Amino acid sequence: MQPSSIVVAGLGVLVLLARPAAGSQASQPTAPQASPQSAAAVPDFPGFTVKLTFSDKASNTLLARKETVIVAAYLWGYPKPGTPKHLIDDIGQVDLGEVKSEVAPDKDADFGDFQLKKDPLQQVDSRGPQLLINVFSGRKSSPNNLLDCGIYEGLLKSAREANIKVACKLIGE
């Protein structure tokens, strides 16, 4: 195995098979693929949906500007005692990766079932993988984010039942 493969495996890259909502576009996982030896899959995690709501002004602006919305799902975990330092990020978490779904402002973001890589997941403590959802504009009509949105944070295993809703308005609204 090449040294770069070891580093990639240690980063806790997430292998996701995200299925976007009908009429939406999903970006591929943002991290590089690890070698087959370190990419051993663990049990599936069920997919989940993020329901987006917008203020009238935000909705009208996004539609008029033909702007998209990006829903970013960041996965992480609390490290077990003795977790190798190379698996712990600068804020003390095990990075399990991220996936993004780009949707029209009138669509929900659907994330399909996926698997996490075995190596980093084995270093997560008994609380299990955590999920953080952030939402921002797709920057099609402006180089800057246009949206001020809430977040969602919770257990990954509970995401399907959590009925995740994120409300957005325009920045400064």
Region spans (language model):
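Bacterial N-terminal signal peptides that target proteins for export
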Residues: 1-9
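Beta-strand-rich domain onsets/edges
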Residues: 26-48
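Short amphipathic, basic-aromatic surface patches that mediate peripheral association
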Residues: 51-62
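Short coil-to-beta strand junction motifs in C2/discoidin
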Residues: 62-70, 126-128
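Beta-strand signatures of extracellular beta-sandwich domains
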Residues: 70-74, 132-134
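Tryptophan-paired
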Residues: 78-125
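Short acidic/polar inter-strand loop motif in beta-rich domains
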Residues: 136-147
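Extracellular beta-sheet/turn segments enriched in Thr/Pro/Gly and aliphatic residues
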Residues: 150-173
